[in-house]
Amino acid sequence: MAQSTRLGNLIKSLPGYAPGKVVPGWGTTPVMAGIGFMLLIFLVTILQIYNQSLLLQSISFE
């Protein structure tokens, strides 16, 4: 028997949730867009640290 989790309950509460079906509407698209945007910011920050274009005063990389 499947266990109920907080994440599962959150996804079930979103509008347009129907397992195995494609329903009209946005569904979980805003959640996916938010996660993608946060990943983009994270990767740009890592790239700036690698290229030393992000100034970090108290951290030295040797």
UniProtKB/Swiss-Prot annotation:
Q: Per the annotation, which location comes first and is thus the protein's main one?
A: membrane
Give its localization.
Cellular thylakoid membrane
What is the purpose of this protein?
One of the components of the core complex of photosystem II (PSII), required for its stability and/or assembly. PSII is a light-driven water:plastoquinone oxidoreductase that uses light energy to abstract electrons from H(2)O, generating O(2) and a proton gradient subsequently used for ATP formation. It consists of a core antenna complex that captures photons, and an electron transfer chain that converts photonic excitation into a charge separation.
The record's similarity note reads: Belongs to the PsbH family.
* Gene Ontology process terms (BP): photosynthesis; protein stabilization
UniProt KW keywords? Membrane, Photosynthesis, Photosystem II, Thylakoid, Transmembrane, Transmembrane helix
Q: Which residues cross the membrane?
A: 30-50
Q: Which Gene Ontology terms of cellular component type are present? A: photosystem II; plasma membrane-derived thylakoid membrane
Highest classification ranks of the organism = Bacteria, Bacillati, Cyanobacteriota, Cyanophyceae, Synechococcales
Quaternary structure per UniProt? Answer: PSII is composed of 1 copy each of membrane proteins PsbA, PsbB, PsbC, PsbD, PsbE, PsbF, PsbH, PsbI, PsbJ, PsbK, PsbL, PsbM, PsbT, PsbX, PsbY, Psb30/Ycf12, peripheral proteins PsbO, CyanoQ (PsbQ), PsbU, PsbV and a large number of cofactors. It forms dimeric complexes.
Spell out the protein name for this chain.
Photosystem II reaction center protein H
Q: Name one Pfam family in it.
A: PsbH
